[in-house]
Amino acid sequence: MNKKVVLMILDGWGIATNPKVSAIDAANTPFVNSLYTQYPHSKLEASGLAVGLPEGQMGNSEVGHMNLGAGRIVYQNLVRINKAVTENTLGQEPELAKAFDYAKKEGKAVHFMGLVSDGGVHAHIEHLKSLLSTAQEAQLPKVFVHAFTDGRDTDPKSGLKFMTDLVQHCDKTGAHVASVTGRYFAMDRDNRWERVALAYHAMVDAEGHLTHDVIQSIKDSYAADVTDEFIKPIIATDANGTPLAKIAEGDVVICFNFRTDRGREITQALTQKDFHEENMHRLNLYYLTMTEYDKEFNNVHVIFNDSNLPMTLGEVLEGAGKKQIRIAETEKYPHVTFFFSGGRETPFVGQTNILRSSPKVATYDLQPEMSAADLRDALIPELEKEEVDFVCLNFANPDMVGHTGVFPAVVKAVETVDQCAEAVVKAGLAHGYSFIIIADHGNADVMINEDGSPNTAHSTNLVPCILVDAHDHPTLSNGKLGDIAPTILKLMGVEQPKEMTGGALF
């Protein structure tokens, strides 16, 4: 075979086990439905051990794209960190030990900041609790937590449970919760610096709602219809109303999120550059991150460093002299570039990246179409030229709108993708392209919890794999995301390298 291939990723389009709670099943998707009757298809595992995550852990876009591009199971930092937590060896990690020594010697405060939930997508509360226990063993006198509440990878009001658990653990280990801010502000990844500024000023200047009872303030927030993701900064005070802690020059700050993309902006504001419009100034801190957020960051220490993956699909295609396009809107652009390339920023020879801006709306239920039509309109002319050999295309809608939990909007998002996918596939088939249509994980397939409340998190459901080809209709095996790159190489007639341990699906 010597085909040209488009990998079309319908982000968050899982296979529902209960159609009643699925926006995909509720949506009118004549095109994707027609593919199931005409073309070979199978199911892929996109969560848990099959993608290098702990058993039962839902997949996510970062992990999904890494496995897709690598053509193998990529053992995630989460698994490595979990091992250190369960074996109680976090304190032996050299960068963490050095930071604790510095804090002790210099009498500096240690501030932990990150997402406090068991969602396991960006962070895990058990990691934080283990860090706090490790800090206690190191006899650090001043330890504070700046908690970001979740409500996106977990239920919208589960923050109360997690924060109660955290406060109890702090009481045991001598630490204190200093501030609480919703992830919408603290973990932006779309250059909404006005959001990031709220989190920055909460931690650095103790700006926010002052309270002697953080848990009660979270309850008050719920009563005002503000759920975890959107909680405005809450500042913990002592009995006299004085804030317990502010991040100050020379302090140790540890961002314990292990996923990289949503820790970058707050790290930039605290350590890399001044944002005068938002009155954010970088501080001289002893700053650590759980994993490497950005190779370009200066003076940021990394607790769990990872190496670039060799021989990803992009590198193999470069070696074969093939041209490739990576195309997505802002929200998923790092996924089709950095993560699909195994943690590499630099494009390969013959690689063109096409970016379209995600709409500037507060939440994507307000514009469920997002920028899917822009991607369609950008890619079709490229396919008509017949020059590019491989395309990695991501439609973000089912995932990004799925995270809002607004069912009718998610239905609209799914229908938008069905229409745009149809236009791209028809154009591609007319110009000799084959398509592998998949999802990287589920989301829109489970929109309602058993108690009737909206589900805003990813699912652990299987995802579809459809091979759309004008001529060849081989039987497709079921598999995992790490089998897709070998399948693409087989279609393209390019030899699979030994580093790719996944197997072609036909």
Positions of the model-derived regions?
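Feature captures the catalytic ectodomains and active-site-proximal regions of enzymes
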Residues: 1-506
